[in-house]
């Protein structure tokens, strides 16, 4: 008997022009681990929410979702609440109490369980998740990673049979994300809890999954094992844009197979360990070649020039007796440069952006920028940017406020020209069919794109971007990178806070690490990522010891090709 089964499920949001889900059918057994992937806006979140009655969106639907062969609509509320757990994308959206221990007990208290049972379950979960040191902390004092772990633990205290996770790592730093996914895998493996997980970052989940559901435009395009799906997409990368988001190991050796460097009869590796094993088996003379960095933009100016934006000796704390978040921090960004700022959850990256744009004042230190330079900021929560009832109205308003044309050659300053600019940006960010939608009806990735579009239309000289790639599929990340590169070539300055190491390694001019309230490292990407164990890329870990200095998939592929040529 299947644990969960979708039978020809279709769904459309109110006033939507097309279905968000179209005849979706699949089933999952007890203890299975299924990853749902697909391009941004393809219906992943909508699908997951159909399996959790309490948060199923309003709209018109067909077909039936079954839980243990009983229509989900007929499953008792108590059963659904206890047996089907759901972890959302934003950790803050799910926490409802002030203290960690109370959050763990909240669901159990609502089930009216005896005090002794609640205490036992809370103790058990705190021990399993390693929460002893922060068990009595306020939830407001937790890092993003701790908050998401608390959400997961609170759900597991209810003893669910099915755990649903909607991009649970999208707002977490690399270490916290890996820790969370390791815990989910442990729950699946040791406790037998079925996992239905949606992710754009497939690097750490593909190798753990039993099956992968690949979605496209609301339908299931493929339902297969990770290995088989990888092989299928490698043979036909045009079948889905998700090919660009496959684990780095698979993309590297898929390309090498096509180029004749790697035998085609071998399975594509999905993990770093397997990739290094294949690299060793190739027995190429890597000592005769040197990894060559991929070309970067030439827009970043010499460090001898006056910085476009500078923070000097910045100190900040949220209250007088509180902990210092920034401690004598110094940072400068040159004109036409893209600087990626990395660091753990709670390190102070978003706080720094707010200080640099004037939303918060440091209690010591100065922020310097040319008074004539316009500055715009993309916040971590893009909802804050939208004030109208449609995406089009928001974009058009931003275009009217802009002073120039970054995407249209000639602007007359009139309404028609502003509309043309708004349409072009919408097309570039694949929002044309969403222009009549209310911003809050968009998926997470679509809302992020709309926020980026609104920011670009402001025509600012300095852009502060807080997690701009959050919710974007790999293809849209490439599109965004192209836009950012065009802007830096025009002299636009950018400071980007990101947890996306691959994006930073591929497109940033410099990378900086914020730790303990200070910038502890500030280097060109290759110098920054090479030699690291955790703050580095998949390609860098695969190439370590073979192609020192290679940090992107393209650089590893190029290095292997050169070594293969030397061998021949």
Where on the chain are the PLM-derived regions?
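Conserved ABC ATPase "signature" region
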Residues: 116-134, 396, 413-434
């Amino acid at each position: 008997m299947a644990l969960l089964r979708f039978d020809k499920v279709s769904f459309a949001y109110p006033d939507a022009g097309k279905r968000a889900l179209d005849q979706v059918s699949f089933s999952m057994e007890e203890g299975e681990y299924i990853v749902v992937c697909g391009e941004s806006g393809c219906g992943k979140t909508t699908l997951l929410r159909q399996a959790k009655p309490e948060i199923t969106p309003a709209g018109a639907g067909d077909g039936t979702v079954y839980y243990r062969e009983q229509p989900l609509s007929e499953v008792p509320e108590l059963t659904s609440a206890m047996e089907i757990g759901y972890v959302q994308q934003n950790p803050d959206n799910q926490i409802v109490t002030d203290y960690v221990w109370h959050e763990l007990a909240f669901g159990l208290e609502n089930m009216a369980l005896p005090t002794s049972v609640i205490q036992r379950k809370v103790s058990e979960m705190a021990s399993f998740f390693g929460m002893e040191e922060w068990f009595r902390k306020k939830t407001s004092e937790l890092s993003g990673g701790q908050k998401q772990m608390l959400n997961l633990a609170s759900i597991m205290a209810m003893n669910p049979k099915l755990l649903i996770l909607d991009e649970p790592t999208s707002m977490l730093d690399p270490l916290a994300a890996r820790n969370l996914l390791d815990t989910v895998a442990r729950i699946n493996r040791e406790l037998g809890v079925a996992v239905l997980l949606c992710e754009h970052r497939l690097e750490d989940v593909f190798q753990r999954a039993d099956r992968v559901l690949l979605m496209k435009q609301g339908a299931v395009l493929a339902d297969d094992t990770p290995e088989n799906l990888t092989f299928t997409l490698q043979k036909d990368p045009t079948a889905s844009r998700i090919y660009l988001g496959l684990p780095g190991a698979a993309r590297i050796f898929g390309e090498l197979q096509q180029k004749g460097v790697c035998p085609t009869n071998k399975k594509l590796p999905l993990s770093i360990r397997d990739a290094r094993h294949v690299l060793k088996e190739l027995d190429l003379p890597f000592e005769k070649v040197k990894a060559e960095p991929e070309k970067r933009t030439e827009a970043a100016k010499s460090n001898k020039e006056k910085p476009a934006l500078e923070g000097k000796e910045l100190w900040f704390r949220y209250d007088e007796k509180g902990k210092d978040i920034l401690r004598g921090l110094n940072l400068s960004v040159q004109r036409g440069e893209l600087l990626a700022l990395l660091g753990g959850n709670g390190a102070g990256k978003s706080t720094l952006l707010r200080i640099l744009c004037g939303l918060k004042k440091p209690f010591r230190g100065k922020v310097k920028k040319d008074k004539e330079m316009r500055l715009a900021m993309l916040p971590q929560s893009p909802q804050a940017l939208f004030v109208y009832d449609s995406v089009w109205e928001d974009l058009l308003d931003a275009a009217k406020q802009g002073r120039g044309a970054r995407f249209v050659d000639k602007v007359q300053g009139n309404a028609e020209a502003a509309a043309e600019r708004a349409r072009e940006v919408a097309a570039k960010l694949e929002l044309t069919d969403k222009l009549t939608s209310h911003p809050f009806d968009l998926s997470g990735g679509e809302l992020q794109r709309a926020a980026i579009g609104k920011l670009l239309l402001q025509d600012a000289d300095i852009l502060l971007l807080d997690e701009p790639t959050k919710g974007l599929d790999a293809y849209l990340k490439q599109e965004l990178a192209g836009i950012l590169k065009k802007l830096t070539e025009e002299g636009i300055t950018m400071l980007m806070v990101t947890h996306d190491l691959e994006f930073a390694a591929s497109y940033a001019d410099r990378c900086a690490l914020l730790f303990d309230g200070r910038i502890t490292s500030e280097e060109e990407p290759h110098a920054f990522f090479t030699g690291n164990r955790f703050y580095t890329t998949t390609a860098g870990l695969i190439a370590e010891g073979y192609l020192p200095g290679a940090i992107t998939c393209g650089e590893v592929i190029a290095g292997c090709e050169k070594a293969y040529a030397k061998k021949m």
